[in-house]
Amino acid sequence: GALKGIVGGNRGKEGNRIWNRASDTTRQIGSTIKPITSYVLGIEKDLITYSTVIEDRQVVINPDEVSYSQPLWVPKNEYNSFKGFVTVRTAVIRSINTVAVQVTQMLGTTTSYDFLKYSLNVDTLTAADDSYSPMALGSLSKGMTLVKLAGAYQMFGNGGVRTEPYSYTRVEDTYGNVILEKNTVPVRVISA
């Protein structure tokens, strides 16, 4: 969770307590959400493996399956076609939208939403984000900060363990008295 470096803008420092684009600005994260809400959870719940074959095909989602008051959603791939049967590994490498949506269908959007909100501590989610487009393809209502996104991805390099991102360990005065100390608590969020 320790931030080794952060760049919050492209000019020199202009003052103290100014806006930091990496930690203060939220942005749409798009396909970077797929590994952390669809694929890792599909693997964790034994629904898929890297070699599972899923058909890259047209998927039709009705976001309101009870009253049918909303229009159907038909996600598209970047290449505007379908590749047929592909492995999950290929779907990750090529960032195939329709496969990520199908894995999210297997999981249920609430599983992905709860994992982001409670296990990865993403605090910008809204109730509207508990839906297919935000959870499978990253079209979150408020987006995420780069620091939160990097914090979510750290589980892959830390053996399934995540620590809330932090930028200091302790602050001392000129006499060596500890004024502020960061106590970090690593949490296992996925199996290793």
Task: Please place each PLM-identified region on the residue numbering.
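Structural recognition of the beta-strand scaffold that forms the well-ordered cores
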Residues: 3-7, 30, 52-55, 90, ...
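Mid-domain, small-residue-enriched loop/turn segments at the edges of structured enzyme/sensor domains
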Residues: 68-76, 108-149
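Active-site SXXK
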Residues: 1, 28-56, 91, 152-156
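A penicillin-recognizing enzyme superfamily signal
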Residues: 3-6, 12-25, 33, 142-192
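Solvent-exposed loop/turn segments at secondary-structure junctions
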Residues: 2-3, 10-14, 28, 59-62, ...
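A generic secondary-structure signal for well-formed alpha-helical elements
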Residues: 43-49, 61, 99, 107, ...
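Conserved catalytic neighborhood of penicillin-recognizing serine enzymes
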Residues: 48-112, 174-192
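Extracytoplasmic/secreted proteins, especially bacterial periplasmic and envelope-associated proteins
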Residues: 37, 49, 87, 98-102, ...
